[in-house]
Amino acid sequence: MLVTAGAVGIPGVLIGPLESEFGWSNAEISAAFAVRLLLFGMMGPFAAAFMNRFGLRPVILLSQTLIGAGIFGALWMTELWQLTLLMGVVVGLGTGLTAMVLGATVATRWFVNRRGLVIGLLTASTATGQLVFLPVMAALTEAVGWRAALSVSLVALFVAAIAALMLMRNRPSDLGLAPYGEMAVVPAPPQQSLLAMLASPIVTLRDAAGTRMFWLLFGTFFICGMSTNGLIQTHFIPLCGDFGLAAVTAAGVLAVIGLFDFAGTVGSGWLSDRFDNRWLLFWYYGLRGLSLIWLPFSDFSLY
């Protein structure tokens, strides 16, 4: 999850160099990366079904392979459609296979007690990936070019894939263990047929779409994703460049955001075990909205 989060944060570092080298506009590059975000979200329900049908390890390995293939191909791209295909479609499919649902799936299968805290810790890996990778990627891009920076991310993906192959297990019952908080080993549920597996996300979405709560959550998470992935992660570094801040400095600011994101995500997991989640979301979205309203009126200085 940490390495996948690093791959998700790459576009913010690449927009400036791609504009300079190929002459593509910010809007054209952003449209290609928007395809990645669209697939990142749409793959979530199907990723959960794939994990239930094939297991965690095969899905993780497929995810890392797709991300690696997209980044590797991008090293030789020369046309805008290649950026859309490789960094949009291929990387979007790869990141979508794990980033949205892997943490929740692992927490649900392995933990009964402290499940909210565990989900918070695993979700915080997104912030950690941002904290670790963005400053490194920005520094490498400035020093030796964006292709060398992408090559480093390929090495990280390879290491993560090897770790998943060696260490990842599907369920506690694979090791004869009970989930944390349970006394008895919980057997794996019977497998669905391939057709039922592919249909289950669509059926679930159809049923959920008839409820008011689904659309309320859909709307809030849509705005959340638009302001986080769409606005901050993708456009914050180029925006800071327009105001005279270097890319490495802007990536450092994002790393600070990632640091507080980590603390907030872990704390949110702890709070969700104790308080009404509706009130938690009220404060989270309210504070985020106030910060975004204030941002255009700041002087964009480092401090």
Predicted regions and their residues:
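Extracytoplasmic gate region of multi-pass secondary transporters
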Residues: P11-G16, R206-W270
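Helix-loop-helix hairpin linking two adjacent transmembrane segments in secondary transporters
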Residues: L122-L175
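C-terminal ends and interior cores of transmembrane alpha-helices
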Residues: T65-T78, L287-D299
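Cytoplasmic helix-loop-helix junction between adjacent transmembrane helices
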Residues: M87-A124
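Cytoplasmic membrane-interface "Motif A"-like loop-to-helix N-cap segments
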Residues: N52-Q64, R274-Y285
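Helix-to-loop junctions at the C-terminal end of transmembrane segments
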Residues: M43-L56, G264-D276
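Hydrophobic core of transmembrane alpha-helices in multi-pass small-molecule transporters
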Residues: L2, I67-G70, Q82-T98, F222-I223, ...
